[in-house]
Regions:
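Hydrophobic alpha-helical bundle cores within soluble ligand-binding/oligomerization subdomains
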Residues: 1-160
Length: 160
């Protein structure tokens, strides 16, 4: 190669520009949405962090309540999407492949008018798909989403 330097790995290569986060590897800092990740991990809920990533700011109390309700309403899977996940589990497909297939099937029955709506649907339905896949693999029926639970609690309880 004349005039070009071959680099191993991606060192020094810009893969993408983003406003969502910043990494200072030498200082050991990760900033997400303008906040050090340690601050978010200790002071923000999962829903607050997702809201921050979608809206570029933390939510008010009223916005957070509405966002939690919105996510809860988007958690369900259609019978067709369940069928895809059930078949993937029965056929022994790897979990990531089953998640990909489940997300594709879930997107067919969702009203995703824009990228933000699509992102909320993905965030909401991933725990439902993952838990359904593992329960189907064990020969069990999936647990229906509980809209009263926060998103993180919902995700943890689905596998029980």
């Amino acid at each position: 190669m004349t005039g070009q330097q071959l680099r191993a790995g991606l060192e020094g290569v810009t893969v993408a520009e983003t406003r969502l986060s910043d990494i200072d590897g030498e200082a050991g800092e990760l900033v997400v949405g303008g906040f050090p990740v340690e601050t978010l991990a200790t002071n923000a809920t999962y829903e607050e962090t997702v809201f921050l990533l979608l809206r570029d700011r933390l939510p008010t109390a009223e916005e957070l309540a509405a966002f939690r309700t919105d996510l809860a309403e988007r958690r369900g899977l259609s019978a067709e999407a369940h069928g895809v996940v059930r078949r993937a589990a029965k056929d022994g497909e790897p979990a990531m492949d089953a998640l990909r297939m489940g997300l594709a099937a879930a997107s067919l029955d969702a009203d995703c008018a824009d990228d933000r709506t699509t992102a909320k649907r993905v965030v909401a339905v991933v725990p439902t798909i993952v838990a359904a896949y593992w329960r189907y693999r064990e020969g069990e029926s999936p647990v229906e989403p509980d809209p009263e639970l926060g998103h993180a609690e919902f995700g943890v309880r689905l596998d029980r």
